[in-house]
């Protein structure tokens, strides 16, 4: 969305240069720095658990009733269409910043998106002629997460885990191996992928909660300039902890899209943030730097508590907002039950903490027969909303000194998984789409009806091939855009004196999304007046035209849930929800060792090229910025909710 940031610095995690060059010899000279990246994470086999799983049958019966699922694997990919722009708050005038980049802790693996050489496309030798490869192998198929890592590889991974937000002290601490380095011996960019916003890196003050909130920067050996020097003993402890960090993290950007993934295998939780910016990189950069820590702070006492503290289960939530929450469980309901919060405006501080002191509630309640019943899901959702409010409030403080920030904003999609509980918060038009198997009894009744009706040969083949494995999409969040009639009616009702509140299918003729983080000039007259006259809108009245009021939703995973697709809206310019889950399901059935998120990115580009009468390579040859006319920045994350999707990943 918007005109944003764009260039590349990929991280080839978990492998050596020799291994990559040997595997991708056909890609020499074809490296594109500004395109995108593909990454993956595979849950390690825990002590005492099975080290392998039986192959998946082509037609799988419905899983045993009563079984539960949790995430096992994460496949992610992003592609940029926008050009690179500098932060508005940055003193640098350098516009050569990278537009597509990725960095992570040691258990994530990533590779840049690299098109195959121009040549007649060969059909895959995996036994299926339905898919054509346009990119080189992603990290899953490449085996970057297979087998045991040697000490040398672990060191490479450690050196490649750098901070998005903190300045570097040593070159050795920021060394990173890129795909381009493998082939051309060129050095990787030494600039941080996400620059701090000057003057608002952190706020003064602290609380008891602050000491126990893990922040991504706490996993790095990089220290900020205002921190006290550590003694050698402390540094040794830190380096020892970094060998196997308590939490795993990944951060990436493609154009103005930002992706943030943080997880803990030990405590069974996963945080995913997708921030789709518009008009500038500042809001998504600010979100990736601040929202996660704000969420953890608000969740204290709900999902985690400090050691030595007890949790009052009868305590009331300290958020007094009136909202209605609905929960989805393993039922026949296939619609999108959600909760819409009140108008919000957001803020947080940057706090470094000791991850070892963090204890999630499940550790204190392990004797409970049903842990989910001990969590007030309504309070968790409201805590997410509160975190978003505080993050936007602190971002608004910057607008006083930098009025141009009032033009910029971002869509927000946050997914928090804790065991079998999934919490989704969103503003804007990004989507969380669950792929779910339909009810078995319904399917049996449907098959009985199909026996007595005349079917076409194609329908018969489809039913035979897909059987009971046919998946149904369940969108877990509401979309906030002018494409939703309910949103258009709301804005017109709130602005009865402004006949141009919605113009050319956009809010005030400017923005297609009806809710967003930032974009203050559409929320308060004072931010509109602070802009140069050429950028102002005709602000009628004082009511906001757009809000940051999020869609909130809780879902309890069941045996029927197969995978979850999280994506910015660029995916849905060319896919419906049904098409997206069918594409992923078909792909992983044909290629258990493939990268489904990368495949979706490829299909978006193929459909965009076909729509405008070009081939795949012709589209990618169009310069960034100009290519935005054909497709948006796209970020996709596919989360497996079963024991295993990809054989090569185990």
UniProtKB/Swiss-Prot annotation:
Cofactor binding note = Binds 2 magnesium or manganese ions per subunit.
Reactions mediated catalytically: O-phospho-L-seryl-[protein] + H2O = L-seryl-[protein] + phosphate; O-phospho-L-threonyl-[protein] + H2O = L-threonyl-[protein] + phosphate
EC number(s) of the enzyme?
3.1.3.16
Q: Which SMART domains match?
A: PP2Cc
Q: Which cofactor does it need?
A: Mg(2+); Mn(2+)
Q: What happens when the gene is disrupted?
A: No visible phenotype.
Residues holding Mn(2+) 1: 276-277
Q: Which GO molecular-function terms appear in the entry?
A: metal ion binding; protein serine/threonine phosphatase activity
Chief location category? nucleus
- Major enzyme class: hydrolase
| Record InterPro entries | PP2C (IPR015655), PPM-type-like_dom_sf (IPR036457), PPM-type_phosphatase-like_dom (IPR001932)
PPM-type phosphatase domain: which residues? Answer: 239-641
| Binding of Mn(2+) 2, residues | 276, 569, 632
UniProt keyword annotation of Protein biosynthesis present = no
| GO CC terms, sorted | nucleus
Q: Where is the composition biased (Basic residues)?
A: 148-166
Query: Which residues lie within the region annotated Disordered?
Result: 146-166
Q: Which cysteines are joined by disulfide bonds?
A: none
Keyword terms, alphabetized? Hydrolase, Magnesium, Manganese, Metal-binding, Nucleus, Protein phosphatase
Written domain comment of the UniProt record: The conserved PP2C phosphatase domain (240-639) is interrupted by an insertion of approximately 100 amino acids.
Instruction: Supply the name of the protein.
Output: Probable protein phosphatase 2C 36
Originating organism: Arabidopsis thaliana
């Amino acid at each position: 969305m918007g005109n944003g940031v764009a260039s590349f610095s990929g991280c080839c995690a978990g492998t050596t240069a020799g291994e990559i060059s040997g595997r991708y010899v056909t890609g020499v000279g074809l490296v594109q720095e500004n395109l995108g990246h593909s990454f993956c994470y595979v849950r390690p086999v825990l002590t005492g658990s099975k080290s392998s799983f039986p192959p998946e049958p082509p037609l799988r019966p419905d899983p045993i009733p009563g079984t539960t699922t949790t995430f096992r694997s994460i496949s992610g990919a992003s592609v940029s269409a926008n050009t690179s722009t500098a932060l508005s708050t940055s003193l640098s005038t350098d516009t050569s910043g990278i537009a597509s980049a990725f960095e992570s802790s040691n258990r994530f693996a990533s590779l840049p998106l690299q098109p195959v050489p121009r040549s007649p496309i060969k059909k895959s030798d995996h036994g299926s002629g339905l898919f054509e490869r346009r990119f080189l192998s992603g990290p899953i198929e490449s085996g970057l997460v297979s087998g045991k890592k040697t000490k040398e590889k672990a060191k490479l991974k450690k050196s490649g885990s750098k901070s998005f937000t903190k300045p570097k002290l040593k070159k050795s601490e920021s060394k990173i191996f890129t795909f381009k380095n493998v082939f051309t011996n060129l050095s990787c960019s030494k600039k941080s992928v996400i620059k701090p916003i000057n003057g608002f890196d952190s706020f003064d003050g602290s609380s008891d909660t602050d000491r126990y909130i893990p922040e991504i920067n706490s996993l790095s050996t990089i220290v900020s300039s205002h921190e006290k020097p550590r003694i050698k003993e402390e540094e040794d402890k830190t380096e020892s902890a970094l060998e196997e960090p308590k939490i795993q993290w990944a951060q990436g950007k493609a154009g103005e899209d930002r992706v943030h993934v943080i997880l803990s295998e030990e405590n069974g939780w996963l945080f995913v943030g997708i921030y789709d910016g518009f008009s500038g990189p500042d809001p998504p950069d600010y979100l990736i730097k601040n929202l996660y820590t704000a969420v953890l702070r608000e969740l204290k006492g709900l999902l985690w508590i400090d050691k030595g503290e007890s949790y009052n289960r009868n305590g009331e939530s300290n958020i007094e907002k009136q909202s209605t929450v609905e929960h989805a469980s393993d039922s026949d309901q296939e619609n999108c039950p959600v909760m819409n919060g009140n108008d919000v405006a957001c803020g947080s501080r940057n706090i470094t903490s000791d991850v070892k002191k963090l204890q999630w509630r499940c550790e204190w309640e392990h004797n409970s027969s049903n842990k989910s019943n001990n969590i007030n899901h309504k309070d968790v959702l409201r805590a997410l909303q509160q975190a978003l409010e505080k993050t936007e409030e602190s971002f608004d403080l910057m607008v006083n000194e930098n009025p141009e920030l009032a033009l910029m904003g971002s869509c927000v999609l946050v997914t928090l998984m804790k065991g079998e509980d999934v919490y989704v918060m969103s503003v804007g038009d990004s989507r969380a789409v669950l792929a779910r198997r339909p009810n078995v009894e319904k399917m049996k009744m449907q098959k009985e009806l199909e026996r007595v009706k005349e079917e076409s040969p194609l329908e018969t083949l489809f039913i035979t091939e897909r059987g009971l494995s046919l998946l149904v999409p369940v969108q877990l969040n509401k979309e906030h855009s002018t494409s939703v009639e309910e949103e258009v009616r709301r804005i017109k009702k709130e602005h009865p004196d402004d006949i141009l509140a919605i113009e050319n299918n956009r809010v005030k003729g400017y923005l297609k999304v009806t809710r967003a983080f930032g974009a203050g000039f559409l929320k308060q007259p004072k931010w509109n007046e602070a802009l140069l006259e050429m950028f102002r809108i005709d602000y009628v009245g004082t009511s906001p035209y757009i809000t940051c009021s999020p869609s909130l939703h809780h879902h309890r995973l069941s045996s029927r849930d197969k995978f979850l697709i999280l994506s910015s809206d660029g995916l849905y310019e060319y896919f419906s929800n049904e098409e997206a889950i069918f594409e992923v399901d078909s792909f992983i059935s044909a290629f258990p060792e493939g990268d489904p998120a990368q495949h979706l990115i490829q299909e978006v580009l193929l459909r965009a090229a076909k729509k405008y009468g070009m081939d795949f390579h012709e589209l990618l040859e169009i310069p960034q910025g100009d290519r935005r006319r054909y497709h948006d920045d796209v970020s996709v994350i596919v989360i497996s909710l079963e024991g295993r999707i990809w054989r090569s990943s185990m």
